[in-house]
A protein has these predicted regions:
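N-terminal secretory signal peptides
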Residues: 26-90
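Noncatalytic modules at the cell exterior or secretory-pathway interfaces
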Residues: 125-148
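Beta-sandwich interaction modules
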Residues: 60-73, 115-130
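Solvent-exposed serine/threonine-rich low-complexity stretches and specific carbohydrate-binding patches
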Residues: 106-116
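Bacterial N-terminal signal peptides that target proteins for export
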Residues: 1-12
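Short, surface-exposed beta-strand/strand-loop-strand elements in extracellular ectodomains
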Residues: 89-107
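Exposed low-complexity, polar/acidic, P/S/T/G-rich flexible segments that act as propeptides
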Residues: 96-100, 141-158
Length: 158
């Protein structure tokens, strides 16, 4: 090896050891799956269906486009992850909310992404600084989503 090559290798080793020696330790997030309201499994499987007219007249339309997940009252999560696994290819209309006990909600995702079957979409939302939500709402529905299937899980992360 010539002298310039040795110098270059030495500088590279010094730079690498400096970067490794001065890096901060990375602390892994720990996440816990939340239970859906009225469910007994942390993963919910749905197909977006056409809305129906309620039994007592067209006051509004019934649909199964919302899924709520329960946040335990003593939980102190830094963020919430919605993991949506499409079982169909195509465009999905997705909105996610953190719902608070004062009857307010923060929307943290409102898009119509084009998704690929079996390729998960992970959406992260952050709670208010002095409040924790009591539910995480996942809304998947709209005309563009009709007939498309998906699985959804929500995790609270510390």
């Amino acid at each position: 090896m010539n002298r310039n090559g040795l110098f270059s290798a030495t500088v590279s080793l010094i730079a690498a050891s400096f970067c490794l020696g001065n890096s901060l330790p990375v602390q892994a997030e720990t996440c816990q799956a939340l239970m859906p309201v009225g469910g007994n499994n942390t993963t919910v499987t749905k197909t977006v269906s056409q809305p129906s007219i309620p039994l007592f007249g067209p006051i509004g339309l019934n649909n199964d486009w919302n899924t709520d997940f329960i946040v335990e009252s003593n939980a102190k999560y830094k963020n919430y992850k919605v993991i949506l696994l499409p079982t169909s290819n195509g465009e999905y209309s997705i909105r996610t909310y953190l719902k608070y006990s004062d009857n307010t909600a923060d929307n943290f995702y409102d898009q119509k992404p084009s998704l690929t079957a079996n390729k998960p979409l992970v959406i992260t939302g952050f709670p208010r600084s002095q409040q924790q939500p009591y539910q995480v709402n996942v809304f998947v529905g709209d005309l563009v989503s009709l007939g498309k299937g998906y699985q959804v899980t929500v995790e609270g992360c510390r």
